[in-house]
Structures are given as C-alpha cells and as structure tokens.
A protein has these predicted regions:
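Repeated loop/turn-to-beta-strand initiation elements of outer-membrane beta-barrel proteins
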Residues: 11-14, 56-59, 112-115, 165-169, ...
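Residues on the lipid-exposed face of transmembrane beta-strands in outer-membrane beta-barrel proteins
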Residues: 3-7, 20, 47-51, 104-108, ...
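Outer membrane beta-barrel strand-and-loop segments of large Gram-negative receptors
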Residues: 1-2, 95, 108-110, 114-172, ...
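Surface-exposed extracellular loop regions of Gram-negative outer-membrane beta-barrel proteins
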Residues: 1-32, 40-46, 55-100, 121-141, 166-177, 199-221, 257-271
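Transmembrane beta-strands of outer-membrane beta-barrel pores
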Residues: 9, 20-26, 63-69, 78-79, ...
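C-terminal beta-signal and adjacent terminal beta-strands/loops
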Residues: 243-308
C-alpha cells in the first residue's frame, strides 16, 4: 500500500511516498507445456526535498525508484513475420525494468513563465533492448532482452511561458551521457555516447473561439548493444474551432505533417552488419466534431497519433 507523509518546516519542504508490490505470475507456454514463474517483492520509494529561496525561486532535490513492466507483445513468444527474412517474437523470460533516478533542480517562476533547469543521474537495471540474431541462413530473428545496466548523467530544462494571454509555450531540451552494459548478453565492452532530445509544444489562441496547436519532437542517435537507433523528428499541427455558442467544437489535426517519422536502426556487430528503416503511414489527417450536451468542460489539448 502507498504511504505518504509531508511537512513544511519554515522555508523547507518535504514529501515522501513508498509503494510495495508482490506479483506472483505464472506464464504458461501451451505449445511447450511449460510454466515460467515470475514472483518477486519490490519496494518503490519517492523523496522530494525543496528549499524556498524567495517567492519565485526554489531549490529541489528528488529521488525515485520506478518500475517498467514488459507489455504483452514483448512477452509473447509467438513469431511475427515482418517479411520472410525477418521474424520478431516476444521473450517470456523478460524481467521488469527497474529505474533509480536522482535529480537536482532550480525553479524560477513568475506570472509569465516558469523555468526549471536541472541535473540528473539515472540507473536502469534489467533495461529492455532489442537483439537481432541470425536464425537460419539469411533469416533474422529479433527479440527483447534485459541489459545488465543502463546509466545516464545529464542536464535538462523545462520552460513554460505565456505571451499576452494568447500564446502558451512549453520547451523541454535534454542532453546526457549514456553508457550501456550488455555483458550479460555476450557483448563484453560497455558502450557509451552523448545524446540529446527536445520537445516543443505551443497553443495559440486566435480570437475568442479558435486555437492552433503545434508540437514537435527530436531525438538524436541512441545506443543499442549491437549498434544504434538513428535520429528521428516529427511535427504535428492541429486546429480547434468552437461553434454553436461554444457547445460544439470542430477539430482538424495533422500527425507527422512532413512525413519524417521513421525508425532507422544500424547494427554493426562481429556477427551482423545491417541497416533497417521502418516507416509506417504516419501522416494522418483527422477532421472531427464534438458537442457537449451538459455543462461546459475544460477544453483538452488536441491528440496526435505518432505510433510506429
């Protein structure tokens, strides 16, 4: 059961929480008539400390331990054929990913913007990674495995700003040094690189009933035990027009406006050299209408589908 306590002695702030779980999972492989047990007890604490420097400035220190569990398709060993030469399948022995993170930040805010730069360290145990192997002759098989560990040391920034009560901006760049250890998978040397990403979101109100939204995401190259994922970029746009005395709304959205969203993977290991580009039909134009029969609710941001 989660447990929370908080206290604010003077200009200091304190908040703590703890959550415990004890899953007892029995996975049955029917075709092999085999039971795979996965039973464990884990505790996930969270700690937040703050020191108020002034009405607009604050120092923060945070620690958390989190879990990311594998999804069904990552566990399902039934093969999925992307084409006759490439097979993907889940790994029923895949363990949950455990994440320890510590970050220190400085928050500065007023009526027009808030700024939160920070430094952080993140340690992942049993991190998920895709491994591609030669199955037979020229047929490849890809499945999920657990890394020994994945470490990141970096800096990030969260900027929120409002301009003339018409334009809201959110900008979150992130840069870090990443090191992965896949020695448990037979890859002896640790691999490391610098990488970065950035998210940009904006909402522009035009007149009393029109809102335009733009959001974009960029990620630089990221490591895998066998190579790397190459950089990716996506831009989405949308418009919402309120009608019928604000009881109704017309929505027009465009996901992946410039058709740049794709997953490019480059593998370069002693046993395999490969470059794969996966591209779905990600440019989706959506036109919709909604009508509220009851009390007017707070308008939500537009939704975009950037799944690959």
């Amino acid at each position: 059961m989660p447990s929370n306590t908080s206290a604010v002695p003077g200009t200091f702030g304190f908040m703590a929480a703890i959550r415990a779980e004890h899953p007892d999972i029995q996975s049955k492989l029917v075709s092999a008539n085999k039971i795979i047990p996965n039973s464990y007890f884990k505790v996930y604490p969270t700690l937040h400390l703050s020191y108020k420097l002034s009405e607009s400035r604050e120092l923060q220190l945070n620690y958390s331990r989190r879990v990311r569990r594998p999804e069904g398709d990552e566990l399902n060993p039934f093969p999925e054929y992307a084409d006759p030469k490439n097979i993907r399948l889940g790994n029923p022995y895949l363990l949950p990913e455990l994440i320890h993170s510590v970050n220190i930040g400085y928050q500065w805010q007023n009526d027009f913007f808030s700024l939160l730069p920070g430094l952080y360290y993140r340690y992942k145990y049993n991190g998920f990674t895709a491994i591609t192997e030669i199955y037979q002759q020229d047929v490849l098989i890809t499945s999920q495995r657990n890394l020994a560990n994945d470490q990141a040391l970096g800096a990030d920034l969260v900027l929120n700003a409002t301009v003339a009560d018409k334009l809201n901006i959110n900008f979150t760049p992130n840069a870090f040094y990443n090191q992965i250890d896949a020695s448990n998978l037979g890859y002896g040397q640790k691999r490391s690189t610098w990488t970065w990403s950035a998210n940009f979101n904006s909402n522009l109100t035009v007149g009393p009933a029109t809102m335009i939204q733009v959001n974009s995401n960029y990620r630089s190259a990221r490591l895998t035990p066998q190579g790397r994922y190459l950089p990716s970029f996506v831009l989405n746009m949308g418009l919402r027009q309120e009608v019928l005395k604000k009881k109704g709304s017309i929505y027009l959205t465009a996901s992946d406006l410039f058709k740049t969203l794709r997953q490019n993977t480059r593998l370069n290991s002693p046993e395999l050299i490969q470059r794969v580009s996966t591209k779905s039909n990600s440019r989706i134009i959506y036109l919709g209408f909604s009508y509220n029969f009851g009390r007017t609710r707070k308008k939500k941001d537009l939704q975009f589908d950037n799944s690959q």
